UniProtKB/Swiss-Prot annotation:
Principal location: nucleus
Amino acid composition bias (Basic and acidic residues), ranges on this chain: 81-100, 113-131, 140-172, 179-190, 202-212, 459-506, 636-649
Protein name: Cyclin-dependent kinase 12
Main EC class the enzyme belongs to: transferase
Active-site residues per Swiss-Prot or TrEMBL entry: D842 (proton acceptor)
Keywords from the named record: ATP-binding, Kinase, mRNA processing, mRNA splicing, Nucleotide-binding, Nucleus, Serine/threonine-protein kinase, Transferase
Similarity field: Belongs to the protein kinase superfamily. CMGC Ser/Thr protein kinase family. CDC2/CDKX subfamily.
Domain Protein kinase as annotated: residue spans: 710-1003
Gene that this polypeptide is encoded by: cdk12
Amino acid sequence: MPNPVRHGNKKDSGGSASTMPESSGSVNNKDRQRISSKHKRHKSKHLRESSVPEPQTLSTLKLVEYDDISSDSDTFSDVPAKQERRENDERRPSEKSDKMHKSRHRHQHKRLKEATRTKQVEKERKPEKTQEVMVNKVPSSKDKIISSAKRTADEQEEHGRTSKSSSKDSRSKMHKDKSRREREMKSGHKERSKSHRKRDSSKRYKTSDSPKRKGRSPRRKYGGSPKQDDSHSEGSCGQDYDDSPSRVHASGNFNETYRKNMDSPSYKEPAAYQSSARSPSPYSRKQRSVSPYRRRSSSYERGSGSYSGRSPSPYVRRRSSSPFVSRRSLSRSPAPRKSAKSRSRSPLYPRKSSSSSRSKKQKSQSRSRHSSISPARLPLNSSLGAELSRKKKEIAAAAAAAGRESKGSPLILKKESGDSRVASALDLKKATKVLKLEKPVSEPEMVTATSSETKTISAKKEESEKKPQVQAKDPKISGLKDCKPAAIKEEVLTPKEGVTDRDKDVPPLPPILSPPPPLPTSPPSNIPPLPPLPPSPAVLQQPPPPLPPPPTLTFLPLPTTVAASLTSSHYVRQSSLSTQANSQLPVPSPAKPQPPLIHMVPHMKTSTLPPLPLPPLLLGEDDIESPKEIPPPKSVKKEKDKDRPRHLLTDLPLPPELPGGDPSPPDSPERKVVAPPQPPLKKRPKICCPRYGERKQTETDWGKRCVDKFDIIGIIGEGTYGQVYKAKDKDTGELVALKKVRLDNEKEGFPITAIREIKILRQLIHKSVVNMKEIVTDKQDALDFKKDKGAFYLVFEYMDHDLMGLLESGLVQFSEDHIKSFMKQLMEGLEYCHKKNFLHRDIKCSNILLNNSGQIKLADFGLARLYSSEESRPYTNKVITLWYRPPELLLGEERYTPAIDVWSCGCILGELFTKKPIFQANQELAQLELISRLCGSPCPAVWPDVIKLPYFNTMKPKKQYRRRLREEFSFVPTPALDLLDHMLTLDPSKRCTAEQTLQSDFLKDVDVCKMATPDLPHWQDCHELWSKKRRRQRQSGIVLEEPPAIKAPRKESVSVPGGDAMKNSSPAPTQPVKTESSVSDLAVLGDITQQLNQSELAVLLNLLQSQTDLSVSQISQLLNVQANPDMQLQLEALNQSITALTGAAVPPQEVEPPKETPTLDQVDPLGAGTQGEVQNVLAVLLSQLLKPQEVVDAPGESNGEQSGSNPTAHITLEEEEEPDKHHEQNEEEEEDAGNYWSP
């Protein structure tokens, strides 16, 4: 087993066997001194404050002896390890977190080892056991005998202590026998706690680098001398405990160093620890208890929030496990530890410790124990050591004789306690004198005083506790194991986790850890469990001694009330209290009187003063949880404890009430937890409600619909990550724009620009910002994306045109009112974006969309980003299309503002008046040159900060220009010119904002609703893609250039309703006048159109694009019109008029009726005769148009325009011709981008 080996290591380090106690001790002392020397440098100040360095040698020797004992106890603990392991396995889940914390507190492991060793030794040698228990600090029975002989000589000098101590020793022996029996009875619980401790300690030891640390760990943890507290212990241990269990884990190494420091003489333990080393046999026991005390501290810490691994607090786990026996064993519950301590060490000590924690005397004793513990390591004075040895010898003799005698009589115990008090006072005086002689340090003196007090008190308590504790322990054991109510009481005790341990060992820790008197307040929160556990031992101890009863009475009531209140409050404070306890555990080294170590300092001071130390012990215990109400509650608690100890044993069911109280707090938190979750659940839907509302508008959830829900009409644009299609929702008939997001070329998954656009558009809801309706995919199943990367489509409301397409088409002329309306809407949308802290960063004419009603919307937020006006941070300056890029970006500015968007809008304003971009360059330097020519050269005179820009010197214009903007735009109305001048200011800090533009004379009085709707080409959707294709066709010399020229006049003569009618699928009203066609033509066309529906017209339009010429007979055949002379004349007239208009000799002919599939065959040959490839494409398109028409009479859409399903729709020749030409253009565009169309 790893534990046995480690125990062996410990033994070796500590003086492996009792046979070699002193020599091993000396070696260990040397090692410790070496280790301490490392820390001495850093902690010299703390050493000065906390304790005298000289006594360290003595204390180290004693420590070595103690280590030997602990190693023996470790061997004992190995025997019950299996059972303990079983129990531990059950408790492992809770122990795991504790183990993390336990790594710090190896002293607990010592307890386990000592307990196990004591069991084995008890089996092997009961007499030796009694001797060893009497002399807990002595490494072996031989060492103990030798030390006892020396101590007897010293003790003879001391006043009646020897007789009292001898009686106490005999009693302690008797009590030890009883405690052994009790241990056997409680062995199950102890073994659990031991095994738990064992594993924890073993794990701790594993974490520790050396066995020496293991043996010393208990002392080291607490012994981390005040020096260590200030520097190392505070920093490491205090932080570890205070911070959290996580810290405890993280500081495993820290704990090791901390332990090393404690071992080293430089790390003198607080005076309390030191004094205990020299204290008589009871002190030696106390020292053992001290090590358990350290274990307590660890267990306490474990129990406390920092050891939340087992449970956020001892209360929680104990609550959870009504059998606190297991909890005790797991969490080092005070009762099992008491029994273990009493067994391995004299039961008097545990009793003393518990009684000391419960009574003022006990408090002082526990503090003195701490001091005595530290003296054990740090020999404050040879005189103190002699006194301690004397006391130990006297106590041993007295315990052997008087222990047996006094077991039966509480009066004797009381007397002994009174005598012990007197002796303690004398001892304190002596110790303080010796300390003063050795060193003037007030802390050591206090420690020695406290140690002497603890010695006398411990002796008294041992005597008083012998019978009551044995009896009480047995009932506790039986009650804890057998009775759940008893378990509940112990649970209350156990919640303190080692209340017994603390009383026995922890009381010393509290003095160091909990000097602050505020502990009483903290006890209410955390102590509630602690008082109950000590009360049981204290009850045993306290009832016998009449002297302590008054303080015990006062103390007991508090523990019960405090236990109740603390149990309830402890749950709330568990984590914080545990952290406090943990911090206090490191604070144990607070022998220093540093204010941060207030807890330690008060303890030291209180330990020097017998009455004061008593409250501090309770405070110490309480301090671990909270150091607020220390002194007054302690006395009350002592009295209550004295009364209740018996009552606690009998009133075990009452503690269950405390646990009940504890559960109630958890219940309340649970209720709270339940309540908060519900509100969040309610809140989350509220947050989502608006989005769900938007989705409800489309009656679909984003991403769940497939793109096949839309009929794709055509391609209208190309974006950075895909094409933009015009489509119609099959369910609603609504036109939409599908922006394709292709994933096949994306190495990083979804394009960041698309993600940005989606994220921003969902936050921007404005009438002047394009609305994204939903997102659809082209895969029905998400798994399809793995096989073949699919695509997403952003579904936007459809806008008929964009500003670039309209301006380049030449089909529209904007009046000043139109420009006002456009700019008003544009700047409203931009102001909205800027108020939302978004920069568009890509404003250009092609990203400004219009519909046929003249409504403007800002689109394409792929480059937009959130910006913070409060913090200036750099952004990329490679944004905004070059023609619309402001001068600051051209000069390398990275900390730009929304003014960049205003410049782009200024460029658009000038473009609306000039019908072309005002700055058209293909390079940044050329662009800056054009800007300089119009707006003046950037110079510090007009733009002070321009010299700070990165490219100011490298991109200076060749020539300095003056501002000529007003001259160049003199034709612009003055209000518009003023606005343009302001928007195109070089200095961005002087440039107007979007809000200011709306307040300008040009826009402030504009009412968009009252503005006249611009005459837009309803027959043609003017988008950037279409405009670019037209431009290429013009450059290539294709004749299709003419249709726009023809359309422009038509647009003027044709009323908007006609185009709208076609797009809205409503019958188009006949046009009364047409400039380029005769009335006779209109009449002829009217007659023909009456026989056609829109679907037929669509087929005809497609057909006409492949035909350069159609004879009347062909038209009559295609349209199934009887070739009577009148009709032939009409068709000829129509053909001639169209030929004249288009110059392409392509008469717009009506479409064949969809019912005639043969027309497809006829069309194909016709087309084949004229244009080979084009005709093939058109034939395919025609076939696709006719197939759906055959299925459904509803007409298809021509040129992306909705065609009405009304078969009797009447369309005038103009409408026919416009769609024809529009269709021709679209078809040619489709030829260029034929692959975009999916057959």
